[in-house]
């Protein structure tokens, strides 16, 4: 199974060196974004992709560009809602241009007809370009369920975030209820009270055996970790990558166990 990690994993390391460190730690692929506000941190999406190819890292998912406080506008009749739609369309085109597997999307707000129309417009482009839109489980389960209930498209997929599930709605089994829509993962752990994006050894409360049992039913799923190591004290970037890769290998072993 391919194992991936977020290009920015919590340590301020120059992009090309960071990519090499990720590759040297054993990872196969990366998840990243094309958000201009993170250019100072990661470089442009064009420069990132060049670096990934240079060091031999495959592309996994591309995260949408967004500000959390603006997400609700997508469902409202306003200019900001149209802007969010246009930005999402731009991300879909970027994913197609460079070869990302899908675009991961955060949806938040009150479900509405205009929001449905916007999402269907984006999905029409996704169908044309063959780029799936992966809706991530965040802190709005109601909207998540409404979207999948009311919008039908082969390009409407699901990104499972283990940490969000553990904090916001741990009694809801996304992996089983939406197993046919699953296309990508954001794996990380936390204490069950806040979204820490950490590893199990630092603040773990997730039942990884349960997750492995569900993932064993999937084909060709990448084990992508979305972690931010700065929250964990006295660990170098190299050591944190090593620890993350070990956790990924351990999860892979659990998955293989459940496949037997």
Where are these regions (language model features)?
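Short, well-ordered coil/turn segments that N-cap beta-strands
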Residues: 1-3, 26-28, 53-60, 99-101, ...
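Active-site acidic/histidine proton-transfer and metal-coordination neighborhood
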Residues: 16, 71-160, 213, 217, ...
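Acidic/histidine-rich catalytic cores of soluble enzymes
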Residues: 30, 62, 120-205
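A cross-domain feature marking catalytic cores of carbohydrate-active enzymes
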Residues: 5-9, 32-36, 61-66, 102-107, ...
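Charged helix-capping and loop-helix junction motifs
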Residues: 43-48, 81, 85, 115-120, ...
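Acidic-and-aromatic substrate-binding clefts and catalytic sites of carbohydrate-active enzymes
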Residues: 7-15, 33-45, 71-72, 109-114, ...
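N-terminal pre-domain/capping segments
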Residues: 1-90, 96, 153, 242-260
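Alpha-helix-loop-beta-strand connector modules within alpha/beta enzyme cores
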Residues: 48-66, 120-129, 208-213
């Amino acid at each position: 199974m391919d194992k991936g990690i977020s290009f920015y994993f919590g340590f301020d390391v120059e992009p090309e060196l960071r990519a090499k460190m990720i590759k040297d730690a054993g990872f196969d692929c990366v998840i990243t974004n094309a958000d201009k506000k993170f250019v100072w941190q990661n470089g442009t999406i064009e420069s990132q992709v060049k670096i990934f190819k240079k060091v031999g890292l495959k592309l996994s998912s591309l995260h949408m560009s967004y500000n959390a406080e603006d997400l609700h506008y997508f469902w409202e009749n306003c200019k900001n809602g149209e802007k969010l739609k246009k930005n999402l369309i731009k991300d879909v085109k970027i994913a197609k241009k460079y070869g990302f597997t899908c675009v991961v999307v955060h949806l938040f707000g009150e479900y509405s007809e205009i929001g449905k129309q916007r999402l269907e417009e984006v999905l029409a482009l996704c169908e044309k370009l063959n780029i799936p839109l992966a809706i991530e489980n965040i802190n709005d389960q109601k909207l998540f369920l409404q979207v999948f209930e009311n919008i039908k498209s082969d390009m409407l997929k699901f990104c499972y975030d283990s940490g969000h599930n553990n904090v916001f709605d741990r009694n809801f089994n996304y992996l089983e209820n939406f197993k046919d829509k699953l296309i990508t993962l954001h794996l990380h752990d936390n204490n069950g009270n806040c979204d820490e994006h950490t590893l199990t050894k630092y603040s773990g409360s997730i039942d990884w055996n349960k997750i492995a049992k569900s993932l064993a039913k999937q084909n060709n799923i990448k084990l992508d970790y979305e972690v931010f190591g700065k929250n964990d004290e006295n660990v170098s970037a190299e050591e944190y990558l090593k620890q993350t890769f070990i956790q990924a290998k351990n999860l892979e072993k659990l998955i293989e166990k459940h496949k037997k």
